[in-house]
Amino acid sequence: FNEAGDMPGKIREYCKKTGQKIPETMGAVVRAIFESLALRYRWTAEKLEELTGKKYSTINIVGGGTKDELLCRFCANGTGRTVVAGPVEATAIGNILAQAVAAGEVSGVEEAREIVRNSFETKTYIPAEDLREGWDKAYARFCELIG
């Protein structure tokens, strides 16, 4: 899916080739994209845990994706981890705070993080336990498909 073009068509073709249900509507295509993102987030979190020997119970999502509640819910449910979404304008905030640190107005990363925590709203998404089994099955299939 790295090359530009008819992405819904490419998704449908991939689903057909791999024996998955083919998304017929644009809504079904979007759902397939969001589900695969959530499952890839889980895969990535598990790989990070293997590499670092640490457990990560929370995923922070920043930027424009935080405005999509369905994506955030899928991320929480698909990963089995709490998701903290926000702030939306993370790039601009980070830029300003990096300049403030460089100018000596902010002491460092910890103070900058505290400023963000105290200045911007976030929304927390908790994984729905009643959906766990379905997401686990989807994840097992996802892992088979990606090798």
Residue ranges and their predicted role:
Residues 1-93:
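Activation-segment/catalytic-loop signature of the eukaryotic protein kinase fold
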Residues 67-69, 98, 108:
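Short, electropositive, low-hydrophobicity segments enriched in small/polar residues
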Residues 78, 101-104:
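Short, hinge-like loop/turn segments at secondary-structure boundaries
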Residues 92-102:
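Short, small-residue alpha-helix embedded
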Residues 46, 104-105:
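A generic secondary-structure boundary signal that marks alpha-helix termini
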Residues 105-147:
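Acidic, glycine/GT-rich loop-and beta-edge segments that sit at the periphery of enzyme/chaperone cores
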Residues 6-7, 101-102, 142:
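Alpha-helix boundary/capping detector
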